[in-house]
Amino acid sequence: MRRPTSLFLSKSQFTRGLQCHKSLWLLKNRPELRAEPDAGLQARFDAGTEVGILAQQLFPAGVALEYSSGISKNISTTQELIASGAQTICEATFRHDNVLAMVDILHKGPDGWELYEVKSSTETKDIFINDTAIQYYVVAGAGISVSRVFLVHLNNQYIRMGELDLKALFTIDDVTALTLSRQVDITQQLAEMRQALAGSEPSIDIGTYCNDPYECDFKPYCWQHIPECSIFDIANLRSNRKFSLYYGGVLQLEDIPSDFSLSDNMKIQVEAELTGREVFNTQNIRAFLAAITEPVGFLDFETFMEPVPSFDRQRPYQQVPFQYSLHIYEKGKLRHHEFLGETGRDPRQDFLEKLLEDSQPCRTILVYNQPFEIARLQEMARDFPGFAEGIDSIIARIVDLMEPFRNRDYYVKTMCGSYSIKYVLPALVPDLSYDNLAIADGEMAMLAYARLAKLQEDEEKKKIKTALLEYCRMDTLGMVKIWQKLISMTQPKGQLSLF
């Protein structure tokens, strides 16, 4: 017999229940089915904690409660602090109607207590009002007179110069009216959640709510019946249209009705999946290749971003380049240049100095996903205007190697709807693989670079640096091989030998 489910709810459980009752039920009854957060998601959680702690400094006289003290202890301590005249309490803890709320910052204002909810986002989003609404419900229900509710978030226009300016780093939005407008629904919402929790696993099919507003960590369980390369893998097809097919009984690509509207690129993908035929537009690819002139550079950046800027001329969540790989092909020979910034200092100026020198011989510079590299270059030109002329010269020579694949001038079913280099490379050059690399994608590279700054052991630092260089080098070597393969496929056999 299944043991009774606890009907006690935390703020995060309440907002989970708003997204999906089944997700809440699984959390309470089958937590072992929950996907563990990957390193990237955990890093974002940690960043949110960092921002929350930093925001407490907006109220320097505040008293902060420790989560490790336990919920019951913190509830009683909160009441004691209020009774003793405390003006600011961080992580103030309340319980009402069997719901727990821990307020990031509770401050005594001129007209009563003020709630401050801190987010590591750079804007106030509608979904955040669900957080403030349930907090207000609990705190007011616990007998506290709440006069105003605020949402504290990062200001993405803040540019660090010298010491952090916390008042400029954070933006404080008054969300009192929005918070109050949702109070009328909370009692009913809680009743519906508790009714769902009291029964067996809710019979709720997958839907857009599996990814909106957040990707659910029970998705691997609920989506286990979805095969590889299903209708959900059709690139650029809107989510609601995918689910209209799914709810109509269509899951496999071959079952898509003939009158269902698809773009030309979507049709190419579906046809390739069904027939196994390779799509190769020789004319378009030849025209693309004709615009590439030797010496040819193959360039890739790695970047990091952080909510709280560490360096001058840096903004919250700005993508900061810390590494590049540049292969140069000229007259049948290939040479390689690379850069990896030293941790603990702003890498951008050193990055630019070496890149401008290394890329000087290139007449064409191939990148994969041109908007990303160009945006980073333009940002560095803005932040370091002394390099602007050289940066403009690089931008003028950039050609996007992604173009033939994004346009579906080349497509095979193993690409599964994607034109990411991680799918294109194995399709064209199956013997070149990231599988044996310690670092296999950009997010891993960013996390490794962040870890590098915290390490003391030289041997471990050396291993990570080597792994970073190997990964970035593989990206640009892969670009070389893709370019080579496209050339060889557009010319008669035996006519061309690049390497």
Range-by-range predicted roles:
Residues 1-111, 239-275:
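Metal-dependent nuclease catalytic cores that hydrolyze phosphodiester bonds in DNA/RNA
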Residues 94, 283-361, 382:
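Conserved RNase H-like, two-metal-ion catalytic cores of nucleic-acid enzymes
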Residues 108-112, 225, 247, 329-332:
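Short acidic-glycine loop/turn motifs at beta-strand connectors
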Residues 216, 299-301, 367-370:
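Short His-Asn-centered micro-motif
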Residues 250-308:
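Long, highly charged low-complexity segments
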